[in-house]
Amino acid sequence: FLMADHTKAVVSTGNAEIDDKMGGGIPLGSLTLIDGHSHAGKSVLSQQMMWGSLYDGFRLSFFTTENTVKSLVKQMISLNIDVQDFILLRRLRVYPMEVASAREGNLDALLAGIRSERLRGSDIVFVDALTPFVLSTPASQVVSFFEGCKRLCSEGLTIVNVIHSHAVSSELLVRIT
């Protein structure tokens, strides 16, 4: 496996067409929000971004309300992306989150988990999807979560959050971007 090149300004998604549309890839140290309707391809895009990041040698953590480890591996294999070796080598750590606990609005615990993964050596953290958290959490706590993410990004962590469009009002979207 390759070692991460931390001198690069962006991380390739592993797909030249996607990279071109994103200005070369994912900017390192950035906070990215993938927002779209159900079945718009948000998870597929984030999985493609994960693959490119892993291929570039980065260490990733993936918090998911959408998959188990097994279903994630199966879904990615269906996209011709095999991450099993990365999981076994702990270059990709996957944390399934129960939707029921997410609905309690526990964004503080999620932020603590992201912070912990940074301390464990992750370069990039993906959260797919924030939707169950955001739907049951006051706007002020959602803003606080994104402010915490921005602080972690200022320390060099790259964070990619996925959310369904219906979960975020345009007013809240303006506050978090």
Spans of model-derived segments:
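Hydrophobic helix-cap positions at the C-terminus of alpha-helices
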Residues: G25, G52-S53, E117, L152
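Conserved phosphate/pyrophosphate-binding and hydrolysis machinery centered on Walker-type P-loop NTPases
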Residues: K8, S12, A40-S43, F62-E66, ...
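Pre-Walker A adenine-sensing motif
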Residues: T13-G25
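Charged, amphipathic alpha-helical linker segments immediately N-terminal to NTP-binding catalytic cores
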Residues: F1-K8
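Conserved P-loop
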Residues: T32, H37-A100
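P-loop NTPase motor core
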Residues: L107-T177
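A short, flexible beta-alpha/helix-coil linker loop
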Residues: V99-A102, T131-F133
